[in-house]
From Swiss-Prot:
GO MF term list: fluoride channel activity; metal ion binding
Entry membrane topology: Multi-pass membrane protein
Protein name: Fluoride-specific ion channel FluC 1
Organism: Brucella suis biovar 1 (strain 1330)
UniProt keyword list: Cell inner membrane, Cell membrane, Ion channel, Ion transport, Membrane, Metal-binding, Sodium, Transmembrane, Transmembrane helix, Transport
Family, as annotated: Belongs to the fluoride channel Fluc/FEX (TC 1.A.43) family.
Location of the protein in the cell: Cell inner membrane
Plastid listed as a keyword: no
Name of the encoding gene: fluC1
Chain segments annotated as transmembrane: 19-39, 51-71, 80-100
Task of the protein: Fluoride-specific ion channel. Important for reducing fluoride concentration in the cell, thus reducing its toxicity.
Superkingdom of origin organism: Bacteria
GO cellular component: plasma membrane
UniProt-annotated binding residues for Na(+): 58, 61
Length: 254
């Protein structure tokens, strides 16, 4: 039954190399890569290994049925077997390349169409990410300058990129700055001590694979929910929301 079904779906290999099916496979893999990249952009995932893994897995599933059919039908003759072997090899390589090309196309499409821009977006993890017009280093400098001008303390800066370099590893520019107002922070910790785990405020400037720079901070309102803060913290949280928003907007803008 399986062989009869494959015979219906696959052209006889004795007719020559199944180019039409190969083209269909490549197109399917390209579209898969495009959709995968757009979805990754939508959910704000920058894990390249995960994206590629999803794409490759889908690509393999797309052409596996064709490859299996080719192998089954190859039993007809040696020439058919050679055609099947060539098809499987070309299909695997072309499928991988098509998936990668589709992922690149999806990323470019998202940039051009602004379909899923992460600009000023709050995602489920409580992170607010805005695109910065400046380099990572300059963005962090602007965070520090604005925070100080608003009476906040700048506690420390951590250059993750430099740390990676010292460890002999590669990492795009990534820098963390910690700042805040002890008066507001103390009120929050008097309410729930565990919020000290997320204080002072942290801002991370980072460069993505396309060279764009982003500034990510914790959403103070989300932190209030995470630590189940009470009414006594409302004023301090509102002040933190305003202060963090002002600093972020200035640091990432003109």
């Amino acid at each position: 039954m399986t062989r009869e079904f494959i015979m219906l779906m696959m052209p006889p290999l004795t007719d020559g190399f199944p180019l039409d099916i190969l083209v269909a496979n490549v197109v399917a893999c390209f579209l898969l890569g495009t959709v995968t990249a757009l979805y990754a952009r939508k959910i704000h995932s920058r894990d390249v290994h995960t994206i590629i893994g999803m794409g490759m897995m889908g690509g393999v599933s797309t052409f596996s049925s064709f490859a299996y059919g080719s192998v089954v039908l190859a039993s007809a003759s040696m020439s058919a077997f050679l055609i099947a072997a060539a098809y499987v090899t070309v299909s695997v390589v072309a499928g991988y390349v098509a998936v990668l090309a589709g992922m690149k196309f999806g990323e470019k499409s998202a940039d051009i169409l602004h379909r899923y821009p992460p600009m000023a977006s709050i995602i489920d993890s409580g992170l607010v990410t805005v695109e910065s017009r400046h380099s990572v280093a300059e963005t962090i400098e602007r965070v520090a300058a604005k925070a100080k001008s608003m009476g906040m303390n700048v506690f420390t800066r951590v250059d993750h990129g430099a740390g990676a370099k010292e460890a002999g590893l590669g990492l795009p520019p990534t820098e963390l700055i910690i700042f805040g107002n002890p008066q507001n922070g103390t009120v929050l910790m008097q309410d729930k001590r565990t919020i000290g785990l997320d204080l002072p405020i942290r801002a991370l400037a980072w460069e993505d694979g396309s060279g764009k720079v982003w500034l990510t901070v914790n959403d103070p309102a989300w932190l209030a929910q995470r630590h189940s803060l009470g009414l006594s913290s409302d004023v301090a949280i509102k002040a933190m929301v305003t202060g963090t928003g002002t600093v972020t907007k200035y640091a990432a803008g003109d």
